[in-house]
From Swiss-Prot:
The keyword Plastid does not apply. It is found in: Cytoplasm. Its main location: cytoplasm. It comes from the Bacteria. The gene is nadK. This is NAD kinase. Its EC number is 2.7.1.23. The keyword Cell membrane does not apply. Its cofactor is a divalent metal cation. Keywords: ATP-binding, Cytoplasm, Kinase, NAD, NADP, Nucleotide-binding, Transferase. It is an enzyme of class 2 (transferase). HAMAP family: NAD_kinase. Pfam families: NAD_kinase, NAD_kinase_C.
């Protein structure tokens, strides 16, 4: 039997009344069940909770043992990068569009969540990537990503030139619009749209997917998650950037390299007991339907 939970964190950045209603319903339901609840302070303000215990993601990560993220995949990615620093499990209620990482249907969320709170859930550890933009002798600029780190030009789309080193050995050079470096979690996101393979979440692997390469022979490359990737550039790299989960942007200056490796952090994602990854591919991405 999985451990049960005592303190529940409620997280989200709602844009729609339906999402706010879900936050409010969830808060009062958890309190009626006798749980200690800490809710995102901005959400508490938006729904008019005056006596609730509130905090930011850091406080929720430190105090709660389960965080319920209400929203879409973007909300989950933003919260997960912070919550992965702490010993806290995370589950999502989908109030977005695709909801690939947010398992719980808002119309049936309380029933599913009740089973989870009773200890009936599946554990899954998702690793993150760490991106460092660095120059010798200087402090690097660092961010993490759940889905992917993307190398791309800045404000104007154009072809860029770079070299890729894996474990400090030259692997390939490329002229393209950029490069997507994705985790198994991110293999069903931007990487998939660019022609990358689907990696099941239990794989310790990273996929490198070229973006519109100026060659007929370029193909996605899958490597061990234990490998490090170094991107080197010509002297004209002032308008290059790397973005993490399309939410954090690190500009690249002349003379700087980018190093991407597996982060020490991991996301403790949990799912309902009946969760099936391949069913998620089918329902969310309209993947192959069962024939018989």
């Amino acid at each position: 039997m999985n451990k049960k939970f005592k303190c529940i964190g409620i997280v989200g950045h709602p844009r729609h009344p339906e999402a706010l209603a879900t936050h409010e319903m969830l808060y009062h339901w958890l309190k009626s069940k006798g749980y200690s609840v800490i809710i995102d302070r901005q959400v508490a303000k938006d729904i008019g909770l005056k006596d609730a215990q509130t905090g930011g993601l850091t406080e929720i990560g430190k105090q709660a043992d389960l965080a319920v993220v209400v929203g879409g995949d973007g909300n989950m990615l933003g919260a997960a990068r912070v919550l992965s620093r702490y010993d806290i499990k995370v589950i999502g209620i989908n109030r977005g569009n695709l909801g690939f990482l947010t398992d719980l249907d808002p119309d049936n969320a309380l029933q599913q969540l009740s089973e989870v709170l009773d200890g009936e859930y599946r554990n899954e550890h998702r690793f993150l990537l760490e991106a460092q933009v660095r120059r010798n002798g200087q402090k690097p600029r660092i961010s993490t990503a759940i889905n992917e780190v993307v190398l791309h030009p800045g404000k104007v789309a154009h072809m860029i030139e770079f070299e890729v080193y894996i474990d400090e050995r030259f692997a390939f050079s490329q002229r393209s619009d950029g490069l997507i470096i994705a985790t198994p979690t991110g293999s069903t996101a931007y990487s998939l749209s660019a022609g990358g393979p689907i990696l099941t979440p239990n794989l310790d692997a990273i996929v490198l997917v070229p973006m519109f390469p100026h060659t007929l022979s370029s193909r996605p490359l899958v490597i061990s998650s234990e490998s490090s990737i170094r991107l080197k550039f010509s002297q004209n790299s002032n308008d290059y950037e790397v973005s993490c989960d399309s939410q954090i942007v690190l500009p690249i200056q002349d003379g700087e390299d980018v190093i991407i490796s597996r982060s020490k952090q991991k996301l403790n994602l949990i799912h309902p007991q009946d969760y099936n990854y391949f069913n998620t591919l089918s329902t969310k991405l309209s993947w192959s339907k069962k024939m018989f």
